[in-house]
């Protein structure tokens, strides 16, 4: 990485974009991304990338499009401004000159000259930042060899527009959540259907995505693999899902509440009332084992519960078969 590309990256990331997460408008979820500039990764990389292409990139626009095929990145081809890079070089050169001179004994007049040069350089940097912003605002956006449209010439809005398309294309199973995200405050309610926190309409929205979680658990079980909460989270936060952590916790909790799976921590089978605390504690995720719940004859369970409520005078006997057995 050259000094010039390093400085251009700092301007793009720190002065133009100023964030490492972009909100998906359809569900309000923040998606992190990594930065790239001319094929060079800068900083920590994520599943998604915003890849800036500078005027010095050695490939043609058509080649740039072709090279983007099959990649989970938004390519931002900066509008060509030959002076940006030459002015960046001058900026760096002047900074070095001032720094070197300040380390020596200089006269009062030389000091004034350096001060003037420094002020000019500060102005040059501000002007450069504005020009880079304008270049991003007029950039060509490319995802998977196809151009993406945006009507905005605001740098961040334009990149955000392109990123919306990248999220939609990468996380094709995000639609199972139907534009919703759930919060950690809803985990307890999902595990306890009688709590009334989810009405029938809300609960029905959880059905399709929770069945996807159940299918994942059953597939892993069939392969003889132990499934932990961490296993589920790692798989479903990644593509093609892109689901957020709290929503996954709510879906696991909902499966427990509907007696589809059980949660065991350190060998202890958890009651529904204990589930939320374990799921919300990410440090427990690697030790929290999710298993398909054994199915029971519903008529026998109902009869046994009736026996408990009527014969044993226990109106609050649990509905879950396993909890009823332990009651």
Question: Which residues does each PLM region occupy?
Answer:
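Extended alpha-helical interface modules used as scaffolds for assembling large macromolecular complexes
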Residues: 1-327
């Amino acid at each position: 990485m050259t000094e010039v590309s390093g400085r251009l990256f700092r301007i793009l990331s720190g002065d133009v974009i100023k964030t490492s997460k972009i909100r998906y408008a359809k569900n309000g979820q923040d998606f992190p991304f990594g930065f790239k500039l001319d094929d060079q990764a800068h900083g920590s990389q994520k599943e998604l990338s915003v890849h800036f292409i500078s005027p010095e990139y050695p490939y043609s626009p058509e080649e740039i499009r072709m090279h983007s095929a099959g990649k989970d990145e938004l390519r931002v081809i900066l509008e060509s401004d030959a002076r940006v890079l030459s002015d960046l070089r001058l900026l760096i050169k002047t900074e070095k000159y001032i720094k070197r001179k300040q380390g020596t004994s200089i006269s009062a007049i030389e000091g004034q000259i350096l001060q003037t040069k420094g002020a000019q350089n500060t102005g040059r940097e501000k002007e450069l930042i504005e020009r880079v912003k304008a270049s991003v605002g007029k950039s060509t956006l490319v995802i998977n060899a196809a151009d993406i449209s945006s009507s905005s010439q605001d740098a961040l809005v334009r990149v955000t527009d392109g990123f919306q398309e990248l999220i939609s294309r990468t996380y094709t199973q995000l639609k199972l959540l139907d534009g919703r995200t759930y919060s950690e405050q809803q985990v307890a309610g999902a595990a306890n259907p009688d709590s009334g926190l989810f009405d029938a309409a809300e609960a029905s929205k959880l059905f399709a995505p929770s069945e996807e979680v159940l299918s994942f658990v059953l597939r892993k079980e069939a392969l003889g693999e132990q499934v932990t909460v961490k296993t589920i989270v790692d798989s479903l936060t990644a593509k093609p899902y892109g689901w957020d952590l709290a929503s996954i916790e709510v879906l696991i909790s909902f499966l427990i509440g509907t007696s589809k799976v059980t949660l065991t921590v350190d060998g202890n089978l958890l009651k529904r009332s204990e589930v939320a605390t374990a799921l919300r504690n990410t440090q427990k995720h690697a030790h929290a084992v999710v298993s398909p719940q054994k199915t029971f004859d519903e008529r026998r369970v109902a009869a046994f519960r009736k026996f408990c409520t009527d014969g044993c005078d226990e109106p609050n006997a649990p509905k879950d078969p396993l909890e009823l057995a332990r009651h």
